Amino acid sequence: MSRGLFELRKDAITGWWVAVVVDREFNPRRFNRAAKHIGQTPDDCPNCDLAAGGDHVQVRTLKQDAFIVAGTEKEAREAAPGGREPGLGMVGDNGSYQTIVAPRGHHESLAETSPQIAFDMLAQARDVLTNARNAEKTDYLQIVQNFGTNAGALTDHLCFDFYDLPQIPHRIGEELGGAARFVIREGECPWCRMVREEVAEPARLVYEDAASVCFAPYASRSPFELWVVPRHHAADFGTASDAQLVSAADTLQSVLRLLASLALPKSAA
């Protein structure tokens, strides 16, 4: 009996369903596109100008108060000048858009940079999280690293973008609620169970060391989606120790190098 074209898989945490193609072999040529670069040099790169005279990772603020919660079209129209006062239900300017910038001249990928730079960038990410929480002006902070214009990068410089948002994204809220329900139902942390099960049945296992495990999730939402999950049970990246960040940086670089060995595009991380 045919298995069908798609396999409907259920995310064990959120309960969401994903359609996964199962009737064809993987064809790397469909994804084998070289990462495109802008062609910047240290002399015409704005991030290199920012890092001039320094050999350390820095944080650059691109826009304070970057977000306005407009709500529905009706709510946005009512909150416009001449309409309802923002204090009656609309949220004013808040949040931020910032970037963690590697030192001048660092136009390599995260996989290719030095272990020290990788650690320093993760340490800055940890500090950004801690500072945002202490300021009590954020609900969620998302950190993103793009490489190549294919992935939306606007610079060749090695950097992390981060967005300080005034609300929790829907999927994150579903993961938080789903994890709580999982603990009540199963009596253990869902990510701790994933670590144990993916190592025991390594069909989707990509990399593991003493501190972390990397695997392709069962109900993956996109090609090459990978999860790096620490073995240490903790919920707050902002409390990670330097030793844990050294290990996390090594894991990320190792996984990215494995992806590069597939001769696939170095377009996103």
Residue ranges and their predicted role:
Residues 1-269:
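HIT superfamily nucleotide-processing domains
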